[in-house]
Amino acid sequence: MSRIEPHAIPPELLLKAYRAGIFPMADSRDDPEVFWVEPKMRAILPLEGFHLSRSLARTLRRGKFTVTCNAAFEAVIDACAAPRPGAEESWISARIRESYIGLHEHGHAHSIECWHNGRLVGGLYGVGFARVFCGESMFSREPDASKVALAWLVASLRKVGAELLDCQFTTPHLASLGAVEIPQSQYLQLLSKAQRPYSSGELAAARALADAVGDGLGIGGAGVVKGDAAALGLPAGFAALRAEGAGSSSPGNVIAQSLTHTS
């Protein structure tokens, strides 16, 4: 772990760190400094191993929550940093907050939000690149809200061919949903594999997906540049799933069906 000066981490440096398997944290909400973390053991959630319980499947199908992507990134990170019962402090400092907002503006940090009656009641945010998504934090103000956000995340990542969902540290909550712990050395191998160059077929598929959902993202197939088929990443997968569920009374039906096939 090494200390750096107290100002927002440049997006290029932050993304480079994630590509190398390390990430920043702060000691407290008011800490002006950050330290770089490379855990000896790493939690990941295998995308084909998400545990979809019957109760969560019912919640998805009922459509209790309205789910969005990148609609309220700052509100999500603020909710994740807010004091909670039994956890008054947070590693999400002002510096961490500004750093991830900057990365979001550069297209590599994303959020998923759960709304109920117009109120933000759950969500998560993280960092996306290549075939990788690194989950940073989640919050829930109503039962199952964060689980629904995670279910949409997993289904969306699978839709765009992602291979690695990094959870950083394991918790009982994440373990109940399928997260497992592996040595950092094994994680780095998976990380390297997930960043391999894209094949012409993968680039073509990404362009086709961009054309299909481009209106919702403000882009088209031409926006998929050489070398980064995942430039669209989570938002494209999310938009595609929303489009598939457009004719349903509950878009969550699509998510439940998708995850039931492998859960």
Curated annotation (Swiss-Prot):
Main location: cytoplasm
GO molecular function: leucyl-tRNA--protein transferase activity
Catalytic activity: N-terminal L-lysyl-[protein] + L-leucyl-tRNA(Leu) = N-terminal L-leucyl-L-lysyl-[protein] + tRNA(Leu) + H(+); N-terminal L-arginyl-[protein] + L-leucyl-tRNA(Leu) = N-terminal L-leucyl-L-arginyl-[protein] + tRNA(Leu) + H(+); L-phenylalanyl-tRNA(Phe) + an N-terminal L-alpha-aminoacyl-[protein] = an N-terminal L-phenylalanyl-L-alpha-aminoacyl-[protein] + tRNA(Phe)
Cytoplasm found in the keyword field: yes
The protein's name: Leucyl/phenylalanyl-tRNA--protein transferase
Natural source organism: Novosphingobium aromaticivorans (strain ATCC 700278 / DSM 12444 / CCUG 56034 / CIP 105152 / NBRC 16084 / F199)
Function of the molecule: Functions in the N-end rule pathway of protein degradation where it conjugates Leu, Phe and, less efficiently, Met from aminoacyl-tRNAs to the N-termini of proteins containing an N-terminal arginine or lysine.
GO annotation, biological process: protein catabolic process
GO CC entries: cytoplasm
Similarity remark: Belongs to the L/F-transferase family.
PANTHER family assigned to the protein according to its UniProt record, in alphabetical order: LEUCYL/PHENYLALANYL-TRNA--PROTEIN TRANSFERASE (PTHR30098), LEUCYL_PHENYLALANYL-TRNA--PROTEIN TRANSFERASE (PTHR30098:SF2)
